[in-house]
Amino acid sequence: MLGSGILHGTTFQKKLVAGALICCLTTHVDAGVVLLYHHVDEGTPAITSITPDQFNRHMDIIVAEGFTVLPLDELVKRSMDASSGPEKSDEKIVAITFDDAYRSIYTTAFPNLQARGWPFTIFVATRLIEEKNPYYLTWAQLTEMSTHGATIANHTDSHTHMIRRLDAEMADHWKGRMRRELLTAKGLLVDHGLDSNLFAYPYGEYDEETLNLVGDLGMIGFGQQSGAIGPHSNPLLLPRYPLAGVYVGEAAFREKLRSLPLPVLHPQIEPMVSDNFKPPLELSFITNTLNLSRLTCYGPGGLMALSETSSTNVLATPAEEVSVGRTRYNCTLPKGNRFYWFSQLWIRKQSDGSWYHEP
């Protein structure tokens, strides 16, 4: 793949993939889809919110589409199983996740999910809980939900931008600081009986060093890039569909539920861009049986230019430069009434080299 660098798999990543293949040989499914919510509220910022009515409608659609809601760790194991043959299952599976532990998860989402008997995962930045911030959950609420199907997982201690270095910060100091972020959060979760090896990158940001750190600590990592999980997914950078603001429409939600992992080879591309602000994306497919003429990719400026460099390789080039902040390319390929789906993150600093501000 092309880009400013390639993210190489860690030893942990390879062991995790092997373990997933061994443990679940009788439960292979086509894909596992993970949903990502933040606020379930009408009075919070639209960019991270879904209304209670919209959330309930999403849950009803899950039922109507015949999906089984699984705990997140089980969904990962089953969807990354590469077995085939008579044991293969056609079961459609989905997992529900929330980032940041906002209070509306307890007051609005939890009663809905509890009534349905569905498991879910909350990724918690523990310092916000420790500080008793009124906008966030309490340890008592997290513990209560954990007894009713919730997995409480790691989202760092302070919800920091993991890829950002302090002024004049050396690599070893940065690594130590990030280890403390992860281990402090883990320690607090363990102290409350809420241990998990699941981790979500704050803001969905990552680079090679953060992925390696998460792998070295034996965690499974989740981003905020779209797509479904399959046998070739990177267990340190699993996709989730962010659902908020303008991205909660019912038709689009059904398409995301039905989506399949685009069968391309990993590793992922290093997302940070520093000189070429129109970074190309090379997709290397694991098979030459797909009709790649139906592949569509969107990026800055809309539809991306595609060129087949071989029977299994496609190069996608954006019409415009990626903007300052976080940008994603999204590629889809139809399969019947479903879509293969792949998303790639890009990160660009401001022109003076400083970091962008969050909205």
Region locations from a protein language model:
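Metal-dependent polysaccharide deacetylase catalytic core of the NodB/CE4 family, i.e.
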Residues: 32-46, 65, 90-94, 102-104, ...
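Short, compositionally biased P/S/T/A/G/V-rich stretches that sit at domain boundaries
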Residues: 243-277
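N-terminal secretory signal peptides that target proteins for export/translocation
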Residues: 1-12
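N-terminal pre-catalytic segment of deacetylase/amide-hydrolase enzymes
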Residues: 29-93, 259-268, 317, 338-359
